[in-house]
């Protein structure tokens, strides 16, 4: 029975992990940080964003780091997913503790956008790097392989045409995101009803919010929406979606649903990020679309969908994006994007894990 230490701090990473586990033998035992009652910590305890938030939780993060390094002694291998600020130092400490411990990094940090030096650190401390973007491999010397994209394993619904019956609203998975995005989405929904007539309004809620008091999280205006915990099905049925920046924007693009990306950070966090990251786009679909068109990812001229960021984000901007988007062009180009990513990644990652464990 192989024991795997997992560090999956993000909601999206846990969705990818669940799909991966379907491709692994049932006797694999998982320990660490992931969505499970048996885990050391729940990913919800790491649900922070912004530089000030990190400083405020530093004591907890250091404690969790120390416990994960100790827990690694029980593991046959280590699987790190995304969350590079936590996981790269973790890989370094585990490798120092046991140089023979096999470490896989799946869902690589965006070294093509900033902190390119992280690529060298990953190759130094990890044994296999699973790239989910075709262009990522070029930033590494030898240990990275393109394994496919996990969303192509997970998405079961793909549009065959641009039609849809609902408007979908996805204000994020963090409380701070919801507090900023949801009031804007509510106002946009109300004005759209005045202008366009009534359309079903669907609020997609993260699955790990099940059982929580949604009114306390979203406020009284949640009563204006139908609630869905199934993002893929809801996007498939939608005419248009308003989405907080994140993995959901790429999900919408692959499904074929027209959408506008919305994002607003704390002013200080945004200014710091702007100094560190030089990108025209923050949406994954736009970044991939640049690469597809042989442009520098995130810095190209081509755009698949509108992005409303920081002071450009307003109710008026959301309405304009809805009204002016060329839906037919978008749908055609979204099919090209799906072809670019080729296939899913879970089976390849499962094979590489077996290889690292000397089970093949």
Swiss-Prot record:
EC number, UniProt record: 2.4.1.182
Keywords tagged on the record: Glycosyltransferase, Lipid A biosynthesis, Lipid biosynthesis, Lipid metabolism, Transferase
Pathway this chain belongs to: Bacterial outer membrane biogenesis; LPS lipid A biosynthesis
Swiss-Prot/TrEMBL catalytic activity: a lipid X + a UDP-2-N,3-O-bis[(3R)-3-hydroxyacyl]-alpha-D-glucosamine = a lipid A disaccharide + UDP + H(+)
Top EC group: transferase
Similarity comment: family membership: Belongs to the LpxB family.
NCBIfam families (alphabetical): lpxB
Name this polypeptide is given: Lipid-A-disaccharide synthase
Organism: Helicobacter pylori (strain J99 / ATCC 700824)
Primary gene name: lpxB
């Amino acid at each position: 029975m192989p024991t795997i230490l997992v560090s999956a701090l993000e909601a999206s990473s846990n969705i990818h992990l669940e799909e991966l586990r379907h491709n692994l033998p049932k006797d694999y035992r998982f320990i660490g940080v992931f969505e499970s009652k048996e885990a050391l910590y729940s990913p919800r305890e790491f649900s922070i964003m912004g530089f000030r938030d990190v400083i405020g939780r530093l004591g907890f993060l250091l404690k969790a780091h120390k416990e994960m390094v100790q827990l690694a002694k029980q593991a046959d291998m280590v699987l790190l997913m995304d969350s590079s600020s936590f996981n790269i130092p973790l890989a370094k400490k585990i490798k120092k503790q046991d140089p023979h411990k096999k470490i896989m990094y799946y869902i690589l940090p965006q070294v093509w956008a900033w902190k390119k030096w992280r690529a060298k650190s990953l190759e130094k401390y990890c044994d296999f790097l699973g790239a989910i973007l075709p262009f990522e491999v070029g930033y590494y010397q030898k240990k990275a392989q393109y394994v496919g994209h996990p969303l192509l394993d997970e998405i079961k619904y793909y549009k065959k045409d641009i039609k849809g019956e609902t408007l979908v609203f996805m204000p994020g998975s963090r409380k701070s995101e919801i507090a900023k995005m949801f009031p804007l989405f509510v106002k946009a929904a109300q004005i759209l009803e005045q202008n366009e007539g009534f359309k079903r309004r669907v609020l997609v809620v993260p699955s790990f919010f099940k059982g929580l008091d949604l009114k306390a999280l979203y406020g009284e205006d949640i009563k204006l929406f139908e609630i869905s915990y199934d993002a893929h099905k809801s996007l498939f049925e939608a005419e248009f979606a308003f989405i907080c920046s994140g993995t959901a924007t790429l999900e919408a693009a692959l499904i074929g649903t027209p959408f506008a990306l919305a994002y607003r950070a704390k002013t200080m966090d945004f200014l710091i990020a702007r100094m560190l990251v030089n990108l025209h786009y923050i949406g994954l679909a736009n970044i991939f679309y640049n690469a597809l068109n042989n442009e520098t990812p995130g810095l190209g001229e081509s755009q698949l969908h509108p992005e409303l960021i920081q002071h450009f984000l307003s109710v008026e901007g959301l309405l304009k994006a809805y009204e002016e988007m060329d839906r037919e062009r978008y749908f055609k180009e979204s099919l090209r994007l799906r072809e670019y990513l080729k296939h899913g990644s879970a089976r390849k990652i499962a094979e590489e894990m077996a290889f690292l464990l000397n089970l093949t």
